[in-house]
């Protein structure tokens, strides 16, 4: 899986209600880190919109 795919998967997972601990990728892999980065980006986007 490409890093970008994992990022998008994590981003979408946040909006689907997944917890960061639901990351399906093996720890200490690029996909795991990318998925988590996507999840965290979505959460930041969610909170940033809540402030406005």
Task: Give the location of each predicted region.
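Intrinsic-disorder/low-complexity detector
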Residues: 1-52
């Amino acid at each position: 899986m490409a890093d970008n795919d994992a990022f998008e998967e994590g981003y979408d997972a946040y909006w689907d209600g997944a917890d960061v601990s639901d990351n399906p990728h093996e720890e200490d892999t690029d996909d795991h880190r990318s998925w988590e980065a996507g999840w965290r980006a979505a959460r930041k986007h969610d909170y940033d919109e809540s402030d406005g």
